[in-house]
């Protein structure tokens, strides 16, 4: 009898341990966050999914369920750029249901407030910290290989399959892979990886419908070479300077022959001329010491995420990340994809929908370059250039191509949605529902 009780007790403990492990791996619901008054008015889940050999790489995510119809609304897998910028950047500054209150940091936990422009009003969003080393994602062993562009797709695809295995209620929801900035390089590779897996009958089958890219880095040469024409078009350099640059550099401002001293001198003059301009948003004032500045608002995330009470609330594994950094530029990374245009050509054939949008005051990845690589895909236009409106005002311009790609500018917008959050929310709401912009 004693042995039977012992074995029964052991079996119960073993099953309890399995349940606890599953709960930790599946993620847990967060009802309160430090800095926010009262319970959260939306459903937030955080957790880790192990990927790679022996699941040594633990990928951290924030999942916010759609506030409208989560059973049917699209599921967005969101990847922020950088590389190594936490997806919390998008959640808190660009398209999430909460944001930091614009006030001077006084040493206490920064305050959080609700937003009116959350994309989670029309979609469930899975914000992923990737690659490993980003945000709260970590590896149980020291990184054996330097992360790279070409190495992103496989672990993200593995993460998504495992997450959907644990959240089967979202398997039938339309899935879109979304992101901005540098994620424009890797998202097409991820879409291709997921698509190939579906063709190979990988389980679970993913209801992939397309992708969304905001101000996406795509082709190094095209993106960088478009900065000078953009600067001229925005009256940042003179006609004479621009014409001299075109003549001396012959349209190539990146890989300049060292013997072409005239071109190099003109490029130096260009850099000096725009040195006081923010590349991310050319209208952004130099206001480093004002609490409402973007730079100071961005610093609030690091104060907040490094609070012990915050990490406890988010269920971050203790001792895994010494210091949370919003964009961790200290980690080595191999940028081994110079152009993602070939991936776009491949996934265009598959017939996926896509939305590519550009803030028209972004000089980091100018809309001129984005238009250039889209033209290189050689698809006919099915809805030509026209304004799209918000409250009877022009919010930007748009056109749609035969490969189901919609391009849109955001008037007065910068490198990310945070500069025009209301307009980009209305844009994504219309596009996800299949309406014209």
Curated annotation (Swiss-Prot):
Expressed in seedlings and siliques. Probable carboxypeptidase. The active site is at residues 181, 362, 415. SUPFAM superfamilies: alpha/beta-Hydrolases (SSF53474). Residues 1-26 form the signal peptide. Belongs to the peptidase S10 family. This is Serine carboxypeptidase-like 17. Its EC number is 3.4.16.-. It comes from Arabidopsis thaliana (Mouse-ear cress). GO terms for molecular function: serine-type carboxypeptidase activity. Gene3D superfamilies: 3.40.50.12670, alpha/beta hydrolase. It is found in: Secreted.
